[in-house]
């Protein structure tokens, strides 16, 4: 009898996971055109000819809004499974979720007071 009787599927899965990217890259190398023309070296920007410089400095406010968005996006990711299983989790999980939301509200108030949410 085979010793790893419960792990054959895992072994096959790992082999397929290792071979699939290798096969995809190999097929790409075989099927890709070998010549590099002038169009290959040109810049592509949404189907239009690029204009202006590529290196421009963004306002730091974009990053602040992005960070606040990511924080509340992660909050949604954490709270959705909690909301789905709310009835089975009980009072302790409800209190933990309230503490989590309170910490995020404190962070939002801090960002608001520091002016991170104002554009001017």
Curated annotation (Swiss-Prot):
Broadest EC class assigned to this enzyme: translocase
InterPro entries cross-referenced by the UniProt entry: NAD(P)H_OxRDtase_bac/plastid (IPR023043), NADH_UbQ/plastoQ_OxRdtase_su3 (IPR000440), NDAH_ubi_oxred_su3_sf (IPR038430)
Gene Ontology CC terms: NADH dehydrogenase complex; plasma membrane-derived thylakoid membrane
Gene Ontology MF annotations: NADH dehydrogenase (ubiquinone) activity; quinone binding
One record GO biological process: photosynthesis, light reaction
Membrane topology: Multi-pass membrane protein
EC number from the UniProt entry: 7.1.1.-
Cellular compartments annotated: Cellular thylakoid membrane
Keyword Plastid attached: no
Quaternary data: NDH-1 can be composed of about 15 different subunits; different subcomplexes with different compositions have been identified which probably have different functions.
Similarity comment text for this entry: Belongs to the complex I subunit 3 family.
Protein name according to UniProt: NAD(P)H-quinone oxidoreductase subunit 3
Source organism per UniProt: Synechococcus sp. (strain JA-3-3Ab) (Cyanobacteria bacterium Yellowstone A-Prime)
Lineage: Bacteria, Bacillati, Cyanobacteriota, Cyanophyceae, Synechococcales
